[in-house]
Amino acid sequence: IDPADVEKLLELMREQQFGKLVAHAPYTMNLCAAKEDIRKFSKEMIADDLRRMDYTPGNYYNFHPGSHVGQGADAGIEWIAEALNEVLTPEQTTTVLLETMAGKGSEVGRSFEELRAIIDRVELSDKLGICLDTCHVWDAGYDIAGDLDGVLEKFDHVIGLNRLCAVHFNDSMNDRGSHKDRHACIGEGKIGLDAMRRVATHPLL
């Protein structure tokens, strides 16, 4: 990375009053894979990405927690926390975001409780936040169309709204609780335009 390019970007962000950047990890990364070599590669990838992120201090790095591939969610949670304990550093300025997942296949992070369990096992948990994907939580079974207040209240009780740093704003092609993770254009899916509007304008978001 050319430091001169970084400085131009930072200057542009200041001039145009950018909000925080949200970088997204590669989808191939899986911190809780059954195979050790995949876990090792994933840890190296996130560590390298976090080093690069510090060129633009104070932003977000979002990733899918991973798929346990038959080991069970509890084992997956342990692997993810162990990896984060290895790669997070006290000096980093980037907040790492765990993304809410739809629960497709053996995905970890299909419930607020699973995400909380990861956070509780990470020593530098002050470096962690959450990215709430509207399609994913809908497909996971949370009724953001009919009871957005209730979903946010549950999120606050289990994780804490202080950790909610970003929202992936997507409609869903699927019925609530389908665990399929198929996004739709905003207003053209099962969540619907009115519900998406309520998400966009909710005072807690």
Say what each PLM segment does.
Residues D2-E7, R39, K43-I46, I77-E82, ...:
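Charged helix-capping and loop-helix junction motifs
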